[in-house]
Amino acid sequence: MPILHQKIASTGGQPSTNSLALRRLPLVVIPRKRKYKNYVSRRRNTQLLASLRRCVSDPNVYKSYNHWKALLRPMTPIKSGAPTPKTVTPMPVPQIPPHQKMTPNPTPTQNPVQLPLPHAVSEKPGDKKSTGPTPSPVPSKAPISAAKLPGTVTKVAPLLSAAQPPPKTLAPAPGASETNSGSGPVSKQVSGKLTELKSKNGTVTEKTEKAVLRIPSSASTRAKAASAVAPEANPAPVPTATKPSPFAPAIAPLRDGAPAQPPAPIQASAPLRPPVAKQNSLQKPPEPKRSVGAPPKALPSELVNKIDGIEFLPQSSNQNTDDGQQPTTSTGGAKALRRAYGSKSGTTICAIGSPNVPSTSQPQQGDNEKRLIEKKLSLRKKKLSGEGVPPAGSMLTGSKSGVEIGLSSNLTTTNNNNNKEQTDEQRAKKTVNAVAAAFSTQAGSGNATTVDDPASTTTSKENPAAQPPKPKSAAVQNLISQLQLPASVSAKVDKIIACGDKARKPSRSGLQASQARPKVPEIVSSQRTQHQDDKDGHLIYSKGDFILNRFTIYDTLGEGTFGKVVRVNDSLSDTFMALKIIKNVSKYREAAKLEVKVLQKLAEKDPEKKNWVIHMGSYFDYNGHICLLFDLMGSSIFDFLKANHYKPYPMEQTLHITWQLCNAVKFLHDNKLTHTDLKPENILFVDSRYTTKLVDKKPLRVLHSTHVRLIDFGSATFDHEHHSIIVSTRHYRAPEVILELGWSQPCDVWSIGCILYELYTGVTLFQTHENREHLAMMERVLGDIPLRMAKRTKTKFFINGRLDWVNTSADAAYVRDNCKPLRRSMSCTDPEHVELFELIENMLMFEPLARMKLPEALQHRYFNRLPENLKIPCKMDASTNPRINGD
């Protein structure tokens, strides 16, 4: 955009400030590129994400740990005129709209709370000797107790002893809701006093009257709901004046005259309660389901005494627990909890509330809550005292999350209680072992055996036979109902629990049956030992083995990727035969089936065996191995060449072998077959006997007969069948196969040309294992590859019609040293040698269409030197037994 130049307004020879600012502006201003309509910058996107993450509907999750308001639960139960019936559904928690406060508005009759000071509780050591609670007059602002049942006495532990001076009172809050929510000054002062007590780490010396201050939570609400069922089944006994337990939140319902009820079967769909370590202290329990229109269940008010939201535990004489865990005592409470829970860390355990699991056993919920609170308080004691065993005196324990603030003291439990709880713990562990054994027997064998737990106590292992049968406890019944065992498995578990270790001793009949079972697999394995296969799929055999009770194996004639060829004696004809045993691999079995198809076609076209191809006598399947039976031949022309130290065949033998080979392949081509795997290894002598003579003082083997047969039709392909991209062995592979231009019968002619060169020289023409090097050797021996083929190929071997080959590389040096033009390989210039190389040159033409056909090759002048008697194939007489030298 253009910039208008303005004159500099000078006053007194000095330029003005505006003029200097204009001079500093850039000469060219590039307008900012306009964003699209819905463009959101990175900063704005961050703000939007932050706003989405804010959620005020759940203060328990998105508020601080230190906020009391976020940790409150509805504490005052909804009163109902009718008693709470016993039901199998969990206690519902009334739904609270998110826009309302966490606690309901208090009634005008509620009074503010007076909290004791720390020093007021820890002083007066003389009160330790008192054995009973000292009643104190209730002031005008005393707590208003809830209605009591007739005949029951519920004592409220006062906040202070009567002998102590009155503590400083806090300013009353407008309501209990403000006190509980932490919005008033009372919550701040309580938090400050709690911090002061933690810093002093002093012990509470008052032993006569202990006050437990408890902020209600969902855990306590569920615990009180569990205790509500007890008055209906059993009347509450009159509790004695014993000291209340410091583990306030969840033990109270069980110790206020509500004995544990046997748990009812739990529904199969009810999920199990997660482990204690998995419960999050800030997790909000889900609302339990209840029927539509049903009123919320009311808690009995006779078991809880409240003063403006602060609950005091009623005293009870029942200190026993039935959960199988040892209570915390004055001498070894922390150790007992560590032994029971297997925990040595000081991790704070959730006491606010766990996910509400539908359960039919309300006392079981109380047991779980008791475990949570006991472990929490014991670990808190250990952390505050800094020792493994808590001190004898009580101390102030507070939850870091603000759920519980209580003055805990030592529990007064007897040795009988400890023994009873140990027995329950051992019984529960034995039950788990029994259930595990029942599942293992259901999945495996039918013998029920128990699994020993290394962590189990020695008491359960002593005198297993002398222990009388014990009835199933409530824990066992609850466990079985939770797992929903089938009837058969449940019967086994009951038998194991009733009989103890007697079920571990199997009967003699069971042992005899178990010993008799392995005999059947041994018979099968003994039958299979004769037909074992190795890791590659080859049949494992030894000399003298029988196949189908007809063929006796003598020795191995050859081995390849397809399988093995063995010499066998046919008991029917008493002659030696060659048995080709294919690998027990699906790929080679399918190839063998194709070979059988080709051999059957050749036998049909050549019933008199006049075309120099091998014929199959019979075939059969032997334990997954397809076996093909042939006439016994001699060694291959490659094996004989190798045994003769790669001395080339004489010219007359080369002439005869070439004639037979061209006629055999021509017979295949006439029947629309392509062999695709022509090589010296697949050309066998009918009789490979020889004589040895010295030539230049070196032994030289001379064959008696050069009659050959063409074998291995496993890769033979009919013209109408699918043609694989890559065929033939590497050294005898045609260029059109390497360049992936498609192949047909001329690829066999190329292979014949390579074989003729090897017969004449004794060495392989193209000794390589890489396509690019193979093409380079072809160009070195035969000249450049035609441009048409180079352009048609889809391979990456050519650049601009020329082979991508570096002549200065080490590979190029190897090609130059080992390859030379074809004519330079002639040993002499005799007419027969020249004629042979003419035939080889015509067979090794790059273009498949320009390559010599086999009928033309058989008319070549080179074969005019062959005697007529050698042009007729020899007859294979089954009565004769061809032998290999050395047999």
Curated annotation (Swiss-Prot):
Compositional bias annotation for Low complexity: 108-118, 217-241, 407-419
Membrane-spanning segments: none
Knockout-associated phenotype: Viable, but sterile. Defective extension of body wall muscle connections or arms towards the ventral nerve cord. Reduced expression of the late endosome marker rab-7, and the eva-1 and unc-40 receptors, which are expressed in muscles, and impaired recruitment of madd-4 to the muscle membrane. Double knockout with cup-5 results in increased expression of the eva-1 receptor and rab-7 positive endosomes. Double knockout with eva-1, gex-2, madd-2, madd-4, mkk-4, unc-15, unc-60, unc-93 or unc-98 results in severe muscle arm extension defects as compared to the single knockouts.
Keyword Zinc: no
Region (Disordered): 77-147, 163-299, 313-333, 347-475, 504-533
GO annotation terms (biological process): regulation of RNA splicing
Biased composition (Basic and acidic residues): 121-130, 367-377
UniProt GO cellular component terms: cytoplasm; nucleus
SMART domains: S_TKc (SM00220)
EC number: 2.7.11.-
Limits of the Protein kinase domain: 551-863
Disulfide-bond pairs as recorded: none
Nucleotide-binding found in the keyword field: yes
Class of the enzyme per the UniProt entry, highest EC level: transferase
Active site: 677
Biased amino acid composition, Polar residues: 177-192, 314-332, 356-366, 439-462
Keyword entries, A-Z: ATP-binding, Cytoplasm, Kinase, Nucleotide-binding, Nucleus, Serine/threonine-protein kinase, Transferase, Tyrosine-protein kinase
Superkingdom as given in the UniProt entry: Eukaryota
Positions bound to ATP: 557-565, 580
Family named by the database record: Belongs to the protein kinase superfamily. CMGC Ser/Thr protein kinase family. Lammer subfamily.
PANTHER family linked: SERINE/THREONINE-PROTEIN KINASE DOA-RELATED (PTHR45646), SERINE_THREONINE-PROTEIN KINASE DOA (PTHR45646:SF11)
Protein name: Probable dual specificity protein kinase madd-3
Organism this protein belongs to: Caenorhabditis elegans
Name of the coding gene: madd-3
